[in-house]
């Protein structure tokens, strides 16, 4: 029997109901209490996330054990927002208590191990057996109770720094205690977060004493740990074969070795509440000791500003959770000496992708009134524009490099730019540089640019070849392109038409009548061709893609996919009212699930109902039936537009997003996943925190509120 108990939303919304007494974390959205060890052990699939505005993060599970290679108490960004290094994997805590009855050794941490011969999962040490409560909010907090002794561990990341603090309080030592010592043993890999460490080929770790602590160096990276309340004792050791079940499920290498350089030892005094802080920082310099309180205050002020912009969109618990969730993805990025902004596509493994950034920007930045960051994000990608293309993504390791293999990122850039100007009324930035960047995109698409992106004679955009993957359905593995969508893709041309009409209106407003007339002419041509090429009279939905073979013969892919929903959801649609309604009906009947839209209907012969297995198997399912939560935004907006924003349409749109809100405030621990299985019960998968999933929920809630 699962003996974990989650508090209800009404309980959580009242800080007085905090587990174990009051809490100062007003952003707390989740709390669990446990009756025994099984309750905690059953929650190894519940993951929490902390971020700090730089691309650094901390991530782990409710019981405290790591189940992925990407988990750690500090995964720092060596070259923000990328270059992620696992600086501190875990901390093992132990209290030795000497009383008149003898010595008692109490373990609090835990790791997972897997017996290959029997398949048995073992927790060592079994610290999770003492876990009484867990809280998730701006910080994460575990509370352990053993024989009247209470140890509380709280983790916080330092705002805009590559550092963290792990704070402990210990109370309740036996009155006949002769001697009690807290031992804290850091477990370290100091490796790229995509890789794994093996003792056999790890190379040497250098352990060097510093004031109040230790500096550990491995190859080109270092981490410094300090603790004013204790002394560090060097005693190097290794823990072997830590097991990562989530890697095992993905059919990846699933074991790792941890280096332990020694331990901090802190003398405890009976009858007192003892507080101990361990500061962790990437590099050879210790974390500033004053940063814990100042960073907490700065982050709180920052979050309150965001919350004020969205607090009327739903109830208090939901808007608090959305405030923190939305903020997790907005980070700094340095471009040409300027501190600009960008959006991390997803945690733990994604960096900032152009497509994801500009789909997510309206929800994460405009709905939340973060107009300065929105402007800096548009600038970051405009600065790297090449041939009218914004980057598909920045390189993870070379800060000066960018990759441009996308046909839709630039059109989403235009979409985000138009929305930014509309909502911020920032005329000066449009006239200074943004308007020109937007027009550069449209002109490049019209005249032709890289990756065979060009406007055809019919006014529609064609792109790519059989060997390229330029749309968001871009999965390929071992030379297999799973969703070939070269030629004229339906959502690309819906975005193209919307961009032409919207930009024509903007440039006309600012005195560029000739350019406005030209874009309007292109839009009219595209509209006529779109209706002729994409409307499928037989099925009463839109064709997904049309392309020419090497002999010039046209091929039509009439597969029902969610891409067509953009032709019904964007502000400027090339379709009439009846066809927009028909699209909504087809998508609702065949693709809609509680957690988003399927990428294929279940009756399609290429449908994959489970997103699982090896990389090849997962890539094969990625856009072949897998559900994407972000698509709930375009779907619900199409519902609103098809229903003329009526009361019934608003109710239907809100009903569509309710399951995701429950996921956010329930099993998602304040986040929304990248994908879900196409088949019920629609298990979540991919990244546990995805920017556009959160962003589209926020954008939709405001659309409904303003309707």
How would you describe each model-predicted region?
Residues 302-347, 376, 380, 464, ...:
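Conserved oxyanion/phosphate-binding beta-strand-loop segments in alpha/beta enzyme cores
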Residues 466-484:
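A short, charged helix-loop
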